[in-house]
From Swiss-Prot:
Consists of two tandem immunoglobulin-like Big_5 domains in the N-terminal region (residues 56-145 and 150-250), followed by a L,D-transpeptidase catalytic domain (residues 251-378) and a C-terminal tail (residues 379-408). It comes from the Bacteria. Its EC number is 2.3.2.-. A lipid is attached at residue 35 (S-diacylglycerol cysteine). Keywords: Acyltransferase, Calcium, Cell membrane, Cell shape, Cell wall biogenesis/degradation, Lipoprotein, Membrane, Metal-binding, Palmitate, Peptidoglycan synthesis, Signal, Transferase. Residues 1-34 form the signal peptide. Pathway: Cell wall biogenesis; peptidoglycan biosynthesis. The peptidoglycan structure of stationary-phase M.tuberculosis is atypical since it contains a majority (80%) of 3->3 cross-links synthesized by L,D-transpeptidases that predominate over the 4->3 cross-links formed by the D,D-transpeptidase activity of classical penicillin-binding proteins. In fact, 3-3 cross-linkages predominate throughout all growth phases and the ratio of 4-3/3-3 linkages does not vary significantly under any growth condition. It is an enzyme of class 2 (transferase). This is L,D-transpeptidase 2. It comes from Mycobacterium tuberculosis (strain ATCC 25618 / H37Rv). The gene is ldtB. One of its GO terms (cellular component) is plasma membrane. The active site is at residues 336, 354.
Length: 408
């Protein structure tokens, strides 16, 4: 057993011994004054058989965070019981199946609190006993937890243990629309080492992002705790569970695609490690400028324009088998192998918006980038990748991002 636990247990033992010693000494003194005989100390009084008025003042008092018969008790906070003018001698709590609920007694013996989540729509019974100089107090109460009409589950990216790029935001996606965005944000705790200032921004009614003002520093450790269980998220929607994740920021990998040169240049920690010719979107379907975040990677994928609203049989439609595809936008932009356009790469833009590269370069890119790395596209005739694309977060100005849109 850890030394800390032993010390805490020893502390509680000393507190109880002190109270019990005081109880015995008081009982002896009261017996000696009242009887003046040698028959030994009088028995400790209990509430039902109180002795002197002085003892009435020292009867322990029990206070609970819930009331007997309560219905709709929230489950986002511990249930607790506290003793005054005495110490807790025994506390038990069980659910409607008789299963004990875990709890912890404070070192001073004055407070007991649950340490596990309570279930929705469950009935619980709490029994507590306290000892004081004036006797013992007991209390039993039964209550029922809330029964939400709707539940929503949060999902967090990056995954636990991942090493990601300097541009990776924290992403929390719910499986239902969130009416009270502010309540959701308050339930999310993000801790970084070293400390970094960041802010929330909602891409839509279900997904909120958190990022710093500038790209992460390599080596930064990030812990995310989404504590939405039991939290009212508006319009009868409550959190279904809590979720935690820990991830680390890896090397800085930034690729720049310049339409003036039609070259994709990859830098790792500021040093150029690879340059490759590319063919980007033709004038009728130009590649948008801006900062893209690397998402998923596929050794093989079927690209279908209908997945982002362009029918396959339309002039700009397509359905094509593609190898070594690295996603950089939710709107369908990839860095991928395009053997059919090798002759145009470095000279002419021929694609529907993707960054076409040779098969060997596409495989190299696939092998050397990771989720959260950055691709910046510059000098095209296109507009700017929308910040709410899903992988375009860094295109939203920091002042706008920091101001947030929880009330939108």
């Amino acid at each position: 057993m850890p030394k800390v636990g032993i010390a805490a247990q020893a502390g509680r033992t000393r507190v109880r011994r002190a109270w019990l010693t005081a109880l015995m000494m008081t009982a002896v003194m009261i017996g000696a004054v009242a009887c003046g005989s040698g028959r030994g100390p009088a028995p400790i009084k209990v509430i039902a058989d109180k002795g002197t008025p002085f003892a009435d003042l020292l009867v322990p008092k029990l206070t609970a965070s819930v009331t007997d018969g309560a219905v709709g008790v929230t489950v986002d906070a511990p249930v607790s019981v506290t003793a005054a003018d005495g110490v807790l001698a025994a506390v038990t709590m069980v659910n409607d199946n008789g299963r004990p609920v875990a709890g912890r007694l404070s070192p001073d013996g004055l407070r007991w609190s649950t340490t596990e989540q309570l279930g929705y729509n469950r009935r619980y019974t709490l029994n507590a006993t306290a000892l004081g100089l004036g006797g013992a107090a007991t209390r039993q109460l039964t209550f029922q937890t809330s029964s939400p009409a709707h539940l929503t589950m949060p999902y967090v990216m990056p995954g636990d243990g991942e090493v990601v790029g300097v541009g990776e935001p924290v992403a929390i996606r719910f499986d239902e629309n969130i009416a009270d965005r502010g309540a959701a944000e308050k339930a999310i705790k993000i801790t970084t080492n070293p400390p970094v200032e960041g802010a929330f921004y909602w891409l839509n009614n279900r997904e909120v992002r958190w990022r710093p003002e500038h790209f992460w520093k390599p080596g930064t450790a990030v812990d995310v705790a989404v504590n939405t269980y039991g939290v009212d998220l508006g319009e009868g929607m409550f959190g279904e569970d809590n979720v935690q994740t820990h991830f680390t920021i890896g090397d800085e990998v930034i690729a720049t695609a310049d339409d003036n040169t039609k070259i994709l240049t990859v830098r790792v920690n500021g040093e150029v490690v690879k340059s490759m010719p590319t063919s980007m979107g033709k004038d009728s379907t130009p590649t948008a400028n801006g900062i893209y975040i690397v998402g998923s990677r596929y050794k093989h994928i079927i690209m279908d324009s209908s997945t982002y609203g362009v029918p396959v049989n339309s002039p700009n439609g397509y359905r094509t088998d593609v190898d070594w595809a690295t996603q950089i936008s939710y709107s369908g932009v990839f860095v991928h192998s395009a053997p059919w356009s090798v002759g145009a790469q470095g000279h002419t833009n021929t694609s529907h918006g993707c960054l076409n590269v040779s098969p060997s370069n596409a495989q190299w890119f696939y092998d050397h980038v990771k989720r959260g790395d950055i691709v910046e596209v510059v000098n095209t005739v296109g507009g700017t990748l929308p910040g709410i694309d899903g992988l375009g977060d860094w295109n939203i100005p920091w002042d706008q991002w920091r101001a947030g849109n929880a009330k939108a």
